[in-house]
Amino acid sequence: PKEYDNIRIIVYSLPKPAEIKKTPDIIELSISSPDKLSFVKSLIGKEISYSDFTKTIDEFKLVDIRGVTKGKGTSGPVKRFGITLRQHKSEKGQRNPGSIGPWHPAHVTFRTPLAGQLGFFSRVDYNHKLITSGKISEKNINPSQGFKHYGKIISSYIIVKGSVQGPAKRPILLSYPLRPSKDQKKTKYEFQEILV
């Protein structure tokens, strides 16, 4: 097309090298490039790996991690919002809020802590420090019995400081830091070994 406002690409993962599952995950990505059309044409039919972006990520040594958290199902207001337990002699339950709001306006506001869905939320963790990355063929970091709930890493890996949202095999999306912090940039870590 000669005239276009924006170009976005649809990419899919290659689950076979990781041996986690059979069906690929599909995602739509936006592109930042002066000439988007020629950049997209150069990518069609090619595998995009993490190593293609290591030069630009090495400038920051930080990544933003997007993903869906672990699902906890329906849970009460104490676990969901952390409200305090009421006195043991209180009426109509200890693990409920004492009041769900005023008489008027005559509806319950969204701010009232009530039972409902907890977890399986889309979340972004900003400024995770990138410690190291590599391939298993170059350096084997697998524990003897593999990682808990995951197994052994077969292809490539990235080690990040801190915890990452979601269960072991759920896909996550790494992106450049939107608001990189200077303190996180300055801190330096050296990878020794993994203890499980």
Predicted regions and their residues:
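Extended basic (Lys/Arg/His-rich) segments that typically form rRNA-contacting surfaces
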Residues: P1-T74, K79-V196
